[in-house]
Curated annotation (Swiss-Prot):
<dbReference type="InterPro" id="IPR032942">
    <property type="entry name" value="BPI/LBP/Plunc"/>
</dbReference>
<comment type="similarity">
    <text>Belongs to the BPI/LBP/Plunc superfamily. BPI/LBP family.</text>
</comment>
<dbReference type="GO" id="GO:0045087">
    <property type="term" value="P:innate immune response"/>
</dbReference>
<feature type="region of interest" description="Cleavage sites for elastase">
    <location>
        <begin position="235"/>
        <end position="240"/>
    </location>
</feature>
<feature type="glycosylation site" description="N-linked (GlcNAc...) asparagine">
    <location>
        <position position="62"/>
    </location>
</feature>
<feature type="region of interest" description="Central sheet, part 2">
    <location>
        <begin position="221"/>
        <end position="285"/>
    </location>
</feature>
<dbReference type="GO" id="GO:0032715">
    <property type="term" value="P:negative regulation of interleukin-6 production"/>
</dbReference>
<keyword id="KW-0732">Signal</keyword>
<dbReference type="GO" id="GO:0001530">
    <property type="term" value="F:lipopolysaccharide binding"/>
</dbReference>
<dbReference type="Pfam" id="PF01273">
    <property type="entry name" value="LBP_BPI_CETP"/>
</dbReference>
<dbReference type="InterPro" id="IPR017954">
    <property type="entry name" value="Lipid-bd_serum_glycop_CS"/>
</dbReference>
<feature type="disulfide bond">
    <location>
        <begin position="161"/>
        <end position="201"/>
    </location>
</feature>
<keyword id="KW-0325">Glycoprotein</keyword>
<comment type="subunit">
    <text>Monomer. Homodimer; disulfide-linked.</text>
</comment>
<dbReference type="InterPro" id="IPR017943">
    <property type="entry name" value="Bactericidal_perm-incr_a/b_dom"/>
</dbReference>
<feature type="region of interest" description="Central sheet, part 3">
    <location>
        <begin position="463"/>
        <end position="482"/>
    </location>
</feature>
<dbReference type="GO" id="GO:0016020">
    <property type="term" value="C:membrane"/>
</dbReference>
C-alpha cells in the first residue's frame, strides 16, 4: 500500500499486454499502461504454447511423382497420410520495435511427421511407414499495433511473416527396399520445405486475424460503475513501442451516464520512472480520481443524511436538541426534546493531489442541521461549511483499486443560522467526532468496493506495488494467466 487466460487466451498474451502502449499525442492520458520486457517474455511463453497447437493442426498435402531406375525404367511413388506428431518451439522471443510494433522471432524449431509411402514399378509394389523430421525452423513475424479512433479499441495485424527450414530428414521403415526412397528423397524434401514454410506463415497470420483481433474487440473500453458514472478506458492514440517497453495511453476518465460532458480541467503529463522490475505498470493520474469527484459531485451523489439511530448507542453524542442544547442553548429552548437530522453534501468537487510524499484530498462539505418536528417535518437550524484535509491510502484487491480516507484536519465555518448567532467553536468537538467515526466509515465502505483496473480478461495479478509520484500513482504487478 501507499499514501496513495483455450487457444485464444494464450495466443492473445503475445499482444494483449503488448497493446498496453503509448503514442505521442497532444492529449495527455488519464492512465498510462506499460508492459516491460519481462512482461513480454512471459506473454511470449504463453502465446507460443497456443501457436504450437495451431501449427500442429497443419495439414500436409500428399506428394507423388515418378522415379527412374537405371536399366529398369520409370516407376511411381507416393507419400500420403502425413500427420504432424509434434511441433517443438524451444527458442522464442518477442521484442518491441520502436515506432512500429512487435517483432516475434522463433528459432531452432522442429517438426516430427509420420506418414505412409508406396512405390510401384510394373508388377513390383513397395510401401510402408516413414518418420520425417524437419529441423532448424525459423519464424519471423511483425505485429502491427493500432487503434480505432471511433471506438477506442486497440487493433492488431500481422504486418509481415517469413519462415525458413534448414534440414529435412526421412527415415523409412516397412521394407528392405527402402533405399529406393533415396532416388526421390531430395524431391520430397524440397516439396515439403516449400509447403511447410508457406503454411507456417499462413497459420501465424490467420491466428492473429481470427483469434487475436476478435479477442481485442471483446475488451471493453468503458465500464459502468453504478447508476451515476462509468469509466472510459479507451485509447487516445495508437499503441507505440519504445526500446524497452510498450505503453498504452488511456483516456482514464469518469463520465456521467446521464449527461456526458468534459471536466473543466486537463490531465497532467506523467513522467514514468525508468527502473522497472514488474511485468506491467499502470500510471494512474490524479486526473482520473478528480474526474470521479467532479462527476459524482455534479450529479449530487456526494451526500449523506445522519439521524440519531445511526449513532452508536454507547456514544455520548446524540443527534437530539437536548444534546445540542448543551452546546447551543437556544436549540433546546426553541425545539425542546426533539430529534435532529444532519444533511451533509459536497458543495465543491473534492480535489486530490499526488506527491511522492503521499496522496492528499481537500473536501469541502456543507452540513445543514434540522430539528425533526412532531409531524416529522424539518425545521432548519443552522448551516455549516466543513473544510477537510484528508490523507488517502490506496491499495489493490484482485483487479480493483481500493481506497481509504483518513482525517488530518477539519475547519468549521458558520454559513447561516436560523436560531440566532452562536460560536461555531462550540461544535468543533462534535464534528471532530462525527466525521471520523460516522461519516468517513460510510465513505470508506464505498471506497473499499474499489474501481476496476483496465485489464484484459483472465489476468491475475501478484507481487503488487503502489508508489506515489508527482501527479500520479504508479501501480506495478507481475501477471499470471489463468
Amino acid at each position: 500500500m501507499a499514501r496513495g487466460p483455450d487457444t485464444a487466451r494464450r495466443w492473445a498474451t503475445l499482444v494483449v499486454l503488448a497493446a498496453l502502449s503509448t503514442a505521442v499525442t497532444t492529449t495527455n492520458p488519464g492512465i498510462v499502461a506499460r508492459i516491460t520486457q519481462k512482461g513480454l517474455d512471459y506473454a511470449c511463453q504463453q502465446g507460443v504454447l497456443t501457436l504450437q497447437k495451431e501449427l500442429e493442426k497443419i495439414t500436409i498435402p500428399n506428394f507423388s511423382g515418378n522415379f527412374k531406375i537405371k536399366y529398369l525404367g520409370k516407376g511411381q511413388y507416393s507419400f500420403f497420410s502425413m500427420v504432424i506428431q509434434g511441433f517443438n518451439l524451444p527458442n522464442s522471443q518477442i521484442r518491441p520495435l520502436p515506432d512500429k510494433g512487435l517483432d516475434l522471432s522463433i528459432r531452432d524449431a522442429s517438426i516430427k511427421i509420420r506418414g505412409k509411402w508406396k512405390a510401384r514399378k510394373n508388377f513390383i509394389k513397395l510401401g510402408g511407414n516413414f518418420d520425417l523430421s524437419v529441423e532448424g525452423i525459423s519464424i519471423l513475424a511483425g505485429l502491427n499495433l493500432g487503434y480505432d479512433p471511433a471506438s477506442g479499441h486497440s487493433t492488431v495485424t500481422c504486418s509481415s511473416c517469413s519462415s525458413g527450414i534448414n534440414t529435412v530428414r526421412i527415415h523409412i521403415s516397412g521394407s528392405s527396399l527402402g533405399w529406393l526412397i533415396q532416388l526421390f528423397r531430395k524431391r520430397i524434401e524440397s516439396l515439403l520445405q516449400k509447403s511447410m514454410t508457406r503454411k507456417i506463415c499462413e497459420v501465424v497470420t490467420s491466428t492473429v486475424s481470427s483469434k487475436l483481433q476478435p479477442y481485442f474487440q471483446t475488451l471493453p473500453v468503458t465500464t459502468k460503475l453504478d447508476k451515476v458514472a462509468g469509466v472510459d478506458y479507451s485509447l487516445v492514440a495508437p499503441p507505440r513501442a519504445t526500446a524497452n517497453n510498450l505503453d498504452w495511453l488511456l483516456k482514464g476518465e469518469f463520465f456521467s451516464l446521464a449527461h456526458r460532458s468534459p471536466p473543466p480541467f486537463a490531465p497532467p503529463a506523467l513522467a514514468f520512472p525508468s527502473d522497472h522490475d514488474r511485468m506491467v505498470y499502470l500510471g494512474i493520474s490524479e486526473y482520473f480520481f478528480n474526474t470521479a469527484g467532479f462527476v459524482y459531485q455534479k450529479a449530487g451523489a456526494l451526500n449523506l443524511t445522519l439521524r440519531d439511530d445511526m449513532i452508536p448507542k454507547e456514544s455520548k453524542f446524540r443527534l437530539t436538541t437536548k444534546f445540542f442544547g448543551i452546546l447551543i442553548p437556544q436549540v433546546a429552548k426553541m425545539f425542546p426534546d426533539m430529534q435532529m437530522q444532519l444533511f451533509i453534501w459536497a458543495s465543491l468537487p473534492p480535489k486530490l493531489t499526488m506527491k511522492p510524499s503521499g496522496l492528499d484530498l481537500i473536501f469541502v462539505l456543507d452540513t445543514q442541521a434540522f430539528a425533526i418536528l412532531p409531524n416529522s417535518s424539518l425545521d432548519p437550524l443552522f448551516l455549516l461549511e466543513m473544510n477537510l484535509n484528508l490523507s488517502v491510502v490506496v491499495g489493490a484487491k484482485s483487479d480493483r483499486l481500493i481506497g481509504e480516507l483518513r482525517l488530518d484536519k477539519l475547519l468549521l465555518e458558520l454559513k447561516h443560522s436560523d436560531i440566532g448567532p452562536f460560536s461555531v467553536e462550540s461544535l468543533q468537538s462534535v464534528i471532530n467526532y462525527v466525521m471520523p467515526t460516522i461519516v468517513l466509515p460510510v465513505i470508506n465502505k464505498k471506497l473499499q468496493k474499489g474501481f476496476p483496473l483496465p485489464l484484459p480478461a483472465y489476468i491475475e495479478l501478484f507481487n503488487l506495488t503502489l508508489q506515489p509520484y508527482q501527479d500520479f500513482l504508479l501501480f506495478g504487478a507481475d501477471v499470471h494467466y489463468s
